[in-house]
Amino acid sequence: MSVVLELSDTNYSSFMEQTESIVFIDFYSPTCGPCQTLLTFLSILQEHYQDEDVIIAKVNVVKNPKLAQKFMVQSVPLSVVVGKDKMVKRAEVGLLSIDRYIKMIDKALGKGGFFAKLFG
């Protein structure tokens, strides 16, 4: 199983310039209970998408305030899906079910039927 990527103020820009993948980013705080639960979900998402063009990443907002500011993080956990075009496709605040995170990523991948694309 691959390791979840740790993005930071210093490596974010160069990483995003180089990647051509969809990126799921979890903005978290080490003292946030729901954030700790979501961090355990990241390994599940990593395994689920290991054969897809998706990178699972996390950002500690305490250690990386510039990156948190760039994404206008006001509450954690914040989950963001960045498309291959480098644009934010979806952002959700709070702890969601693992199925909801999968739907967020699948939508960015173009998966799902007509109704999933409309209402997903």
What are these regions (language model features)?
Residues M1-F15:
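N-terminal "domain-start" segment that seeds a small globular fold
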Residues C32-C35, S79:
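The canonical Cys-X-X-Cys-His
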Residues Q18-P30:
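Short active-site neighborhood of thiol/selenol oxidoreductases, capturing the structured segment around
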Residues S75, V80-K117:
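Non-catalytic, surface beta->alpha helical segment in thiol-disulfide oxidoreductase systems
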Residues F24-I25, I56, S79:
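Hydrophobic beta-strand anchors of alpha/beta hydrolase catalytic cores
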Residues P34-H48:
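Typically the conserved alpha-helix immediately C-terminal to a functionally engaged Cys/Sec
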Residues V61-A68:
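Structural microenvironment flanking redox-active thiols in thiol-disulfide oxidoreductases
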